Amino acid sequence: MESIFHEKQEGSLCAQHCLNNLLQGEYFSPVELSSIAHQLDEEERMRMAEGGVTSEDYRTFLQQPSGNMDDSGFFSIQVISNALKVWGLELILFNSPEYQRLRIDPINERSFICNYKEHWFTVRKLGKQWFNLNSLLTGPELISDTYLALFLAQLQQEGYSIFVVKGDLPDCEADQLLQMIRVQQMHRPKLIGEELAQLKEQRVHKTDLERVLEANDGSGMLDEDEEDLQRALALSRQEIDMEDEEADLRRAIQLSMQGSSRNISQDMTQTSGTNLTSEELRKRREAYFEKQQQKQQQQQQQQQQGDLSGQSSHPCERPATSSGALGSDLGDAMSEEDMLQAAVTMSLETVRNDLKTEGKK
């Protein structure tokens, strides 16, 4: 199918597309067809002038526009016919009595030119298969042999004029290639207008879909951005809270250290105050020691008296030691322990008294 030459519609140049698709190449241009149209106009003018240039018919003919071409690109059947004569080709009306009497099967022909109003297109046999080369189609349309007659009959019912092309067409690559192979067409080509409408509809649908997707993507991005922002704010708050807690902890430690230093200084002050009354403390200790010694001496005397009364009752028993030595040893032993205990006790009492005095202040 790629080897088949197929010109698509441009403007109203369907006559040009029809001829080039028939001949399978860029054989004619609008300028060449316009030149043929001007020649036909001049031939018609000369025939009209034969009746007199002053006649009413001649003046009317000159005032009328050309019947062989117009500014849109339309060309008449006469222009097409004269263009084909250059290649030795002739056009015969398909439904004319002369052709119908020949009873030729359409599949035995080589090509047809179809016209409806101002549109022209070609149906041609390439190799062993028929193709509709209408320039309004997006590509060549394969026509089976059995469908060809029905296709032509349908065109006639729709008002088309069908012309049979007689003569030898120029050789072309597509004809040579399709002589050896047959092609299959899975999808029929669409009309250019239908394809453009479909493409436009697809573009509109795609645009709408893209807008929806962009809107969704945008909202999704906004949602993601909001989530990221919330996450960042939460982390920031956590960091601030942690910083506040750390600051509070540092502040508490600092205050604790300051309090400890104050307590230490107060203790040092109290200790220094205690040192100032050490003489008084020494006197208290001596008085306490003397009181304890007096108690111990009284206890020793009472014990000696008990021993003497016992000796008078038992004259055979002798004391192991003298009472003076025993009292001295006990006094010495008691004095060392009691002195240590008394010192500790008095120190504690002194500290308590100082604390009470400080508290009252």
From Swiss-Prot:
Residues 294-305 have a biased composition (Low complexity). Changing residue 256 to A: Inhibits substrate trapping. The keyword Zinc does not apply. Ubiquitous. Monoubiquitinated N-terminally by UBE2W, possibly leading to activate the deubiquitinating enzyme activity. Residues 1-180 form the Josephin domain. The active site is at residues 14, 119, 134. There is a cross-link at residue 200 (Glycyl lysine isopeptide (Lys-Gly) (interchain with G-Cter in ubiquitin)). InterPro entries: Ataxin-3, Josephin, UIM_dom. GO terms for molecular function: ATPase binding; cysteine-type deubiquitinase activity; identical protein binding; K48-linked deubiquitinase activity; K63-linked deubiquitinase activity; ubiquitin protein ligase binding. Pfam families: Josephin, SUIM_assoc, UIM. Residues 224-243, 244-263, 331-349 form the UIM domain. Interacts with STUB1/CHIP (when monoubiquitinated). Interacts with DNA repair proteins RAD23A and RAD23B. Interacts with BECN1 (via its poly-Gln domain). Interacts with PRKN, UBR2, VCP and tubulin. Short isoform 1 interacts with CASP7. This is Ataxin-3. It comes from Homo sapiens (Human). The gene is ATXN3.
